[in-house]
Regions:
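Short, low-complexity, intrinsically disordered N-terminal peptides in bacterial proteins
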Residues: 1-6, 122-125
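STAS-typified acidic loop motif
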Residues: 3-36
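Short leucine-rich amphipathic alpha-helices used at interfaces
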Residues: 8-9, 48, 117
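Conserved catalytic submotifs in the C-terminal HATPase_c
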Residues: 15, 54, 110
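Amphipathic alpha-helical interaction surfaces in cytosolic regulatory modules
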Residues: 25-103
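A charged, well-structured terminal subsegment
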Residues: 105-125
Length: 125
């Protein structure tokens, strides 16, 4: 595990129960915890889930896989799955892997939440 990897489970905030903030490195060591948090959210079948990556510094293939699986599950029951707040390093990783074309990505959580309320979801940031 890298020094800035998130060693603890992501914390959901009461005022935004469908927003999952992630921080540090989302890698092989942390992705099982992320997956567990996502599974707990998905079990409730919310109409939307927003992943806040504004404090995440790195993501590897295990982290990407956790997000892809979650997105597929959410969209499978008719929900919406958004990513928000990607910093330049993460944005580059998503662009290189072309996953920026797969995920709905927004500049911040508020924009993602607003988009999830509208009937038309337009741009990826």
């Amino acid at each position: 595990m890298k020094d800035n990897a998130s060693p603890v489970a992501p914390v959901l905030h009461q005022d935004r129960p469908n927003v999952l903030p992630l921080e540090g490195d989302i890698d092989l060591h942390v992705s099982p915890v992320v997956r567990e948090a996502l599974n707990a959210m998905i079990k409730k079948k919310p109409k939307r889930i927003v992943i806040d990556l504004s404090r995440a510094t790195y993501i590897d293939s295990a982290g990407m896989a956790a997000l892809i699986l979650a997105m597929q599950e959410v969209e499978g029951y008719g929900g919406k799955f958004f990513l928000s707040g990607l910093q330049e390093t993460l944005r580059s990783i998503f662009e290189i892997s072309r996953l920026d074309r797969t995920f709905r990505i927004f500049p911040n959580v508020d924009t993602a939440l607003a988009a999830s309320e509208s009937s038309t979801i337009l741009a990826r940031s």
